[in-house]
């Protein structure tokens, strides 16, 4: 099922003609994923970009401001990664776990925004949040995260 995020899968099933009560009863969870290129561990370097640099790389303003004090890594390039700065892939995930509230929203044919709000209140993380944790761990770059999520 192709959607932009996990909450969209609930509304997409309705759009495809799946009876809403079946969505609420049969779906236990939805996992959205993106694959980001993994920074080469042999040549990446830590740096602290300015907020302007983050905004220029298409990272939303609220994410840029929330990242204050966070460590960032960037690609350099070496023989081990063929001068690309990347080697391998890392998953960026969003897991929506079905609960009674979300099941009721599915039956009511609620909007994607309402489903997302309920899922976030139940503990779902956004793709951005998971991606930023991968950036902070030095697994990928903020530029790569913006590339796969925007």
What are the residue ranges of the model-derived segments?
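Short, flexible helix-loop junctions that flank or precede catalytic/ligand sites
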Residues: 1-150
């Amino acid at each position: 099922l192709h959607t932009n995020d996990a909450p969209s899968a609930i509304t997409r099933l309705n759009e495809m003609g799946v009876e809403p009560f079946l969505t609420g009863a049969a779906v236990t969870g939805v996992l959205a994923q993106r694959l980001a290129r993994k920074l080469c561990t042999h040549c990446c370097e830590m740096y602290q970009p300015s907020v302007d640099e983050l905004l220029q790389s298409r990272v939303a303003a609220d994410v840029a401001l929330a990242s204050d004090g966070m460590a960032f890594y960037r690609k350099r390039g070496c023989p081990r990664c063929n001068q690309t700065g990347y080697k391998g892939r890392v998953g960026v995930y969003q897991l929506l776990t079905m609960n009674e509230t979300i099941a009721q929203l599915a039956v009511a044919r609620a909007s994607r925004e309402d489903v997302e709000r309920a899922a976030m209140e139940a503990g779902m993380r956004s793709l951005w949040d998971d991606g930023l944790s991968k950036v902070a761990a030095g697994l990928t770059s903020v530029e790569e995260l913006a590339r796969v999520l925007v």
